[in-house]
Regions:
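Conserved Rossmann-fold NAD(P)-dependent oxidoreductase catalytic core, especially the SDR/UDP-sugar
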Residues: 2-42, 58, 66
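Glycine-rich Rossmann NAD(P)(H)-binding loop
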Residues: 75, 97-102, 130-137, 148-150, ...
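Substrate-positioning beta->alpha
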Residues: 78-84, 97-121, 127-128
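Short-chain dehydrogenase/reductase
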Residues: 29-32, 40-51, 72-75, 79, ...
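Non-catalytic, hydrophobic alpha-helical segments
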Residues: 112, 116, 132, 143, ...
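C-terminal amphipathic/interface module of NAD(P)-dependent oxidoreductases
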Residues: 146, 156, 176-208
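Conserved beta-loop-beta element that borders a ligand/cofactor-binding pocket
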Residues: 52-76
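Mid/C-terminal beta-alpha module of Rossmann-like enzyme folds, strongest
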Residues: 118-176
């Protein structure tokens, strides 16, 4: 792809990476553009390697690039893991996450689309990395409620201690989803917000 761009009239590449390049969870500090890269699965490693190719191929050329690392991308028509949650909600199956007080960043597909458009439109935004997310983070329980509300459904949730959920998930062979469901993954998107304000596009991050 980069070689094709170098041989074309394309002026800028906006590469959609993933927050998985930084890791699967955060502790005290949210991920930012200066955070260490620590991918924990093949998908994250692949995105990290692709970012490296983009930088190495285009950095010293006359082509510009933007790398964006989004977290979970949200829309009313949910896909992937969120679609699985929606199907559970539709079946009125109670979910045991009411007492999980984690915080996870998401980005609305509209917010992400508007920020991509900003990067394409403004020629002075070049060779940058952005972490793009909504200003508000959600607990797993709040995200489930949001999915239900946006689809005109009611969700049933009850409390199960976190340690018990961890044990159950490991026993049933779902240990890989522990971080996704129970731990924090927060993003500091202040750099992206700053650039949006700089170019008078404040409404991009007004949607929570």
């Amino acid at each position: 792809l980069c070689d094709a761009i170098l041989d074309s009239d394309v002026k800028k590449l906006v590469f959609m990476s993933s927050i998985k390049v930084n890791g699967e969870s955060t502790d005290i500090n949210a991920f930012s553009e200066s955070s260490n890269e620590n991918p924990e699965d093949n998908y994250g490693v692949t995105k990290q390697e692709a970012e490296s190719v983009v930088r190495n191929k285009l950095d010293r050329s006359n082509k510009d690039f933007i790398i964006i690392r989004p977290p979970l991308i949200y829309s009313v028509k949910v896909k992937g893991n969120l679609e699985t949650l929606l199907k559970v909600i539709q079946k009125k199956i109670p979910l045991p996450f009411k007492c999980i007080h984690n915080k996870r960043s998401i980005v609305d597909v509209t917010t992400l689309s508007k920020f991509i458009a900003l990067c394409i439109r403004e020629n002075t935004i070049r060779n940058e990395l952005f972490l793009v997310a909504e200003k508000e983070s959600y607990t797993t329980s709040e995200l489930i409620e949001k999915i239900a509300r946006d689809n005109d459904l009611k969700c049933l949730q009850f409390c199960v201690p976190k340690i018990l959920l961890v044990i159950v998930l490991k026993v049933i062979g779902k240990g890989d989803v522990i971080k996704k469901l129970l731990q924090n993954l927060q993003i500091d998107c202040s750099k992206a917000v700053h650039f949006a304000k700089k170019f008078n596009d404040n409404e991009i991050f007004n949607k929570a």
